């Protein structure tokens, strides 16, 4: 049986419990507030983001994860494990394109999927994939769902 690793980005807003339950890896987007750079969900929490945004002189900006951030996560996956990398819609970010570029840089079997959603709608897809992977489904079976 081939194991499947699920990877997503921080816009899915997964809880620490969800990440742990399904062994999901999360690649953080970058947030800049008043010149300070934060890694979403790593160096700034959603509640801290709201507080800082309210006190900010300018609206925050975000940036897709770097190729290095993706390759760093992809390289932690054993080569005999298939990867399904699910991300926020390409209509809002270049995250899918960055994930695709990074996937070509590592010797792993990676399929990058544009969820066409963001936030908890993305999370719903990621959690279904995580449950199916945990139950032993193949990547093709997960994608067919």
Regions from the PLM with identified roles:
Residues 41, 58, 62-66, 87, ...:
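Catalytic cores of large soluble enzymes that bind and process phosphate-bearing ligands
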Residues 8, 85-89:
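Short beta-strand segments
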Residues 72-81:
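Glycine-rich phosphate/diphosphate-binding loops that line cofactor/substrate pockets in enzymes
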Residues 84, 92-144:
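Active-site histidine-anchored catalytic micro-motif
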Residues 5-69:
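N-terminal glycine-rich anion-binding loop in soluble enzyme alpha/beta folds
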Residues 4, 81-85:
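Generic beta-sheet signal
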Residues 69-73, 98:
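Well-ordered alpha-helical segments embedded in enzymatic catalytic cores
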Residues 1, 21, 78, 105-107:
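Short, well-ordered coil/turn elements that cap or connect secondary structure elements
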